Amino acid sequence: MILKLAVIFFSLGIIPAFAQEPSNPTLEIDSISIPHADFNVVSRDSKIVPLNEIHVVSWQVTIHNELMYANPNGNAVVRFYDYNIEDKFLEIGMGSKPDNKFWIAVNLPDDPGYVVMTTYDERGWVPGGAPIILAYTDRAGLTVNNGQRIVLSNLDVETFALKSYSVWGKEGSQDPPAIHSGMFVMDIISGNPTENPLLFFPYVLAACIGGLVAILLVTKKRSS
């Protein structure tokens, strides 16, 4: 019930911002539906797919993971690649039930390389719950909400322009399929906030969702 209220709150807030999209030339938008079978590969065999637009300055990625996992060790991992620096990427990983592990990693070529910034071995995300949101600006860095709360705040990744993505889900090539059905949808919006103040709205909203869920949880505990 708590998560449903958060989703309703999110929907009511986001609709006015996007309603102005057709008349707003400063917005760049990508909506991507990824076939579930694309996750049944190891990372080295994943295909890098270019986005329709290069997202710069200020962007937000909303991830709706409605995949049905095929085994407890299966994962759904998405990497976002930088336009300016080869092999620089952000990684979001979502594990299967019952653990629902979750992690965020960054790969910076040369030094320091691949670094896991935060990880949750249990209850890291909620299948069927609120979406996962990545929000970035050149000045504020990267903030991630796992659908329950903010789990990474203002990480300095220098400039990061989204140009492409890849997905994978198997740890080893001999492992069984990670995913057997379902949907994985990403909505990406970007632009320059100095030209369009409405672009600040999704980032403020992402923080509000985490706060709302926390307040509702505390209220529920006190009333029970």
Predicted features along the sequence, with ranges:
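Hydrophobic secretory-pathway targeting helix
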Residues: 1-25
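Secretory/extracellular carbohydrate-interaction modules
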Residues: 21-109
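Localized edge beta-strand/strand-to-loop motifs within extracellular or lumenal beta-rich domains
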Residues: 126-147
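Short, aromatic/His-centered strand-loop micro-motif at the edge of beta-sheets
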Residues: 108-132
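Flexible glycan-contacting loops in extracellular carbohydrate-active proteins
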Residues: 152-192
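Juxtamembrane/start-of-transmembrane alpha-helix segments at the extracytoplasmic/lumenal side
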Residues: 192-205
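C-terminal membrane-anchoring or membrane-association module
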Residues: 211-224
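Surface-exposed loop/edge segments in extracytoplasmic proteins
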Residues: 86-90, 113-116, 148-154
